[in-house]
Amino acid sequence: MVHPIVSTPRLDAAMVRIRPVALALPGVVERPSHGSPTFFTAEGPKGRTFASVHDEREWHEGRLCLWAACPKEVQEALVSGGPERFFVPPYVGHRGWIGLRLDLPSVDWDEVCGIIEDAHTFVVDR
C-alpha cells in the first residue's frame, strides 16, 4: 500500500527544528515511511529506523508527535513519569519505542533533541 506523504503546517514547523538535529548525526538519511518523515541510520537496506514524526490528526488521538526508539525500561520510566507528554506509540511501542507529544503548549526542544540523539545511539549500538 502506498501511503500519501503527510504535510501539515504544524508538522512542517516541527520538522524545521527536528530535521537539522537528526541529519547532523553520523550517516543519517531521511525518507518518508508510511507517509511520515522518518530518519534512518544509513542509506539503503542497512539503514534502520530510529525516529519518525507524525501528525495524527486523521487517526489515533490527533497528536503531533515524535516516535523514537529506546530501551524498554526507558520507555516505561518516561511514560509512567510523564503520561501527559509521553505515550507508547502504536505499531512500534511493543519494541520499546516512545511517543513524545509535540503539540502541547510548552515543548522542551532540548529534550526532543536529546531523545533523537539517544534513539540514534540506541539503534546504532544494537
Task: State each model region's role.
Residues 1-126:
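Charge-dense, helix-prone N-terminal extensions
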